[in-house]
Amino acid sequence: TEDAPLPDSIFTCPRRSAAAIDSPLEEVRMTGDFGNVSEFMGRHLPFLLAAADKYIKPAIRYQGCAYDSGVDFLLPNRYFTLWSTSDSRIRSTLETFASAGEQLENLAISEEDLRGYILSAYAQALPPSGMLNGRMRFLRRRLFGISTDHINKMIMDIRNSSLKDQRTAAKLIHKIL
């Protein structure tokens, strides 16, 4: 009711959590919250996608039993998600997710590969635009206290990604997970 405010504690989530439900979908997710890791920048996002392409998907989908897997990020909420679907090997999937940062450090990534991951990061970071979409997005961000400046800095920094950033990205992703 309006007279009994909800305690803030119901809105907090544990740092690490996982849930497994016996269903046909069997979706597994691990979320990395980079909101409190100031060193994590837009230039590190393409390396998340490289880890998904060169480590997570081969380990979970092709060698495991999952239907699909990947990595998504949501800049306004400052987190990324490693996910798999129709995955019955929950324990090994979570172990694979947890080691993504360590594995990324030694992945072979060419300049050409990195350019593709940079484009993919832009595609995921830039929401649809239009006359109403932009205004509604601004209002939602303002309402929820989301910094448009921070999001724009992350997006602008994607293009600064270089192979020199791979080791730092790996260490930060490992720290976040």
Task: Give, region by region, the residue ranges found by the protein language model.
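M16 family metallopeptidases and their MPP-like homologs
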Residues: 1, 26-48, 53-163, 177
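An aromatic/glycine/proline-enriched structural segment found at the starts
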Residues: 1-26
